Amino acid sequence: MSSAPPFAAALAWSGHLRRRLDAHPDLAAWLANACAHPVSANVLAAWQAELSGPDAPEVLPVEQCRGMLRKLRERVFLTLIVRDLGGQADLEEVVGAMTVLADIAVGTAYRSVAAELAAVHGLPREQSTGDPQEMLIVGMGKLGGRELNVSSDIDLVMLYGDEGETDGPRRISNHEFYGRLTRRMMPVLSEVDADGQVFRTDLRLRPDGDAGPLAWSLDALEHYLIGQGREWERYAWLKARLMPAQAFADSNPDAQARQLESLRVPFVYRKYFDFDALAALRALRERIRQDWQRRALARNGVDSANNIKLGDGGIREIEFIVQLSQLIRGGRMPALQRRGLLEALHAERAAGLVPEGDAQKLEAAYRFLRRTEHALQYREDEQTHLLPADPAQRAALAAALGYEPAAFERTLAEHRAFVSQTFRNAFRLAGMGEEDDSPAPARTHANGHAMRPHAGALHDIEERLAGQIQRDFPEHAEDLLRRTETLLGSHRVRSLPDSSRHRLEALLPAALTAATQTSAPMDAALRLFDLIETIAQRSAYLALLAEYPDTLARVARMVAASPWAAQYLTQHPLLLDSLIDWRTLFEPLDFAQVAHQLAADLDACRLPDGEPDIERQMNLMRDVQRQASFQLLAQDLEGELTVEKLADQLSALADLLLAETIRRVWPLVNRRPGAEPHLAVIAYGKLGGKELGYASDLDLVFLFDDDREDAAELYAKLGRRMTSWLSTMTSSGRLYEVDLRLRPDGNAGLLAVSLEAFEQYQRSHAWPWEHQALTRARYAAGDTEAGARFERIRADILVMPRDVQALRGEVLGMRDKISAGHPNRSELFDVKHDRGGMVGVEFVTQYLVLCHAATHRVLVNNLGNIALLRLAGEAGLIPAPLALAAGDAYRTLRRAQHQLRLKGVDKARVPPGQLAAERATVCELWQTVLQDGTIAQAEVK
């Protein structure tokens, strides 16, 4: 037996290693050589070939396969003992080697048994193509996540594509073929003989567990997951991975692999989070807490403190913490859709879901506990997670891991205490509310449907609501009773299943109560009923509002404050669950983080063949835009944002989404490897002036700076695809309406224009109104060099010498056209378009820039109307007091327009006596600057 330094720690701890070296003295030299290199996939492949023999057939006979795999497993296990305990192998090497071993073992056993069966029964074939049909072997749990421990069992689910039968002389159904194949494979892997075993195998994670068939068709799996799939199965399928096993020549399982992934992903990661699922996940957490007790009893009551997997602060709790956020948010954040635990934890940290410090502590705890777990299993090659109770053995374990006993116990206690505390707070950390705010469990009917208080027939709830309405809404009782009758009589409500109807019966009285606590109870009640009717068929949202009273109260306040907000929520109920974590909703938008996470999530939207899933990407961008806008809306309604700050934020969001659109669309149109897009997206209008509203269109111009021969065609195609990407109506709605008419020559012009052509057009062919529009234009997204060149061209155009009188006439003429295009035949004042309104300020500002930018270059900067007026006043171009007063008036007019829009008013108009001082100031500014004698103070309504 060798006692060389690399073996010292391993020999001192592992009785299994000592016995193997005693029984096979020649093994020491081989092991010393093997331990000099990492145990990689290539190393395992070489060992497999060596153990199979130089003349081995491509497919080993079953008995030869059994022996080879057991010897291979022994090599891997012994090498890892020495390398791991000697400090040479990190966690990634250990779990990676065991996972590669499992892939080899399962694939080799499958090929051997399948060949034996096919020799008797023939090949199972696909009905559509006639090609040989493989069995799909799915690795679950740690095998799926490539995280196997060194003495792990493996969880497998066996699937296949088409029903049918084999093509041999003794034909059997495909179903029977795969069932027999599974049954015969298991002993090859798990039966213990003189050489030990390869892996214990567990098939109980298949649908219906031990009561179900050994192999399931994909169609049967789909029906099961849709109709009977439970929350714990979502947890189980999160890591599911199709293993690389192929037995038949000329088979092509790619289509079935894609079908499997198309079933797995939406089952595990739901876009619309089901709040029924939240209760189930809480129950799952309790099961994890109690699981160790059940197993401990089976081991004569071993204290949970010694179980580093199932006990408090153990590995299972870390897995739940990480996977909870994946299950809750992974449907909307594809970057979280990772099988590996550490990969997922890193993604959650990058997404801001787990604080940096907590993520580091969780990873450190996980690595420590997994290494300890492996050391326990190295000792006697047992699947154990129990720390020794004997102090001497405990000290020996610490020494094997490189610790003094006291330091080991201290480190272990610190890690487990942190994990345990984090586990208790898992739902709060996942953004699903405080732990003590969790809803009370629902009572249950005998048929299994959830039952809420006051359950009964619809006419009973109508009677109860009538009494509540007459008491709390006496002045509007008749209208609200009529709306209640309409709601309860609607097809959406009458067709509800029992569970949803019971929830509705609890929700409606609660909604009325919440409405009474708002500033506009009647409006809030009607709008809540509209929202409830819209979401009635989505049980998840009924559950949310029924079981989270604080969230219902927040919704009531929002819809009372703004009918536009009520309509927005009704159109996008996906936003409702963001109201659970109210504090997060009021955090400032971190655009760098939004951009980083969006890019990561879009990168993760892949089809099974690796190509981008464009539909998912487009929907994801729309969902992100809605979520960010809703966050701003919540802050807006609570008075946290000025109109200017809100517009800045909405404009920054649009810039971010434009930049990401270029990145996603460019590879779809460019066929030249490595080429970068030299496109600048120029924002005009509200986006150009950073005055964007919640529902504003984007006025865009596409400019390119690229000398490749096909540039004009390429960038026109890019512009078309970008416009489609932004404005196409998908299942998540439309990102933005896009208006491209401000490009050179308008609708008659090219969709994308070179910078040279743009400059020439602006110098020689542009109308004065196009130069007016240019004052509000800016580079928004795309190639920064092209953007900088545009800004230089813009500045050069704005400082061109102009005939002031001619310009004045053009501006006045364009103002008249604007007025004619927006006639106001009412007695109300149109805040934007009437004389004395916002357009007047904007035209004056544009006129001042075009007249005076040559001598006052500061006016070239796109600073917004208020800042430019102030600069004009400071330069003496207009009276400074008037400049400040006009800026204040413009700010007030914008605020009034914004408030009217939030109230759902289409045209921002107010009574004639309102905003009179602001209108007078704007008219004075107009007369002072443009000397328009036809616009007199007396003409203001």
From Swiss-Prot:
GO terms for molecular function: [glutamate-ammonia-ligase] adenylyltransferase activity; [glutamine synthetase]-adenylyl-L-tyrosine phosphorylase activity; ATP binding; magnesium ion binding. Pfam families: GlnD_UR_UTase, GlnE. Its EC number is 2.7.7.89, 2.7.7.42. CDD domains: NT_GlnE_GlnD_like. GO terms for biological process: regulation of glutamine family amino acid metabolic process. Residues 447-941 are annotated as: Adenylyl transferase. Its cofactor is Mg(2+). One of its GO terms (cellular component) is cytosol. The keyword Magnesium applies. Keywords: ATP-binding, Magnesium, Multifunctional enzyme, Nucleotide-binding, Nucleotidyltransferase, Transferase. Belongs to the GlnE family. PANTHER family: BIFUNCTIONAL GLUTAMINE SYNTHETASE ADENYLYLTRANSFERASE_ADENYLYL-REMOVING ENZYME (PTHR30621:SF0), GLUTAMINE SYNTHETASE ADENYLYLTRANSFERASE (PTHR30621). Involved in the regulation of glutamine synthetase GlnA, a key enzyme in the process to assimilate ammonia. When cellular nitrogen levels are high, the C-terminal adenylyl transferase (AT) inactivates GlnA by covalent transfer of an adenylyl group from ATP to specific tyrosine residue of GlnA, thus reducing its activity. Conversely, when nitrogen levels are low, the N-terminal adenylyl removase (AR) activates GlnA by removing the adenylyl group by phosphorolysis, increasing its activity. This is Bifunctional glutamine synthetase adenylyltransferase/adenylyl-removing enzyme.
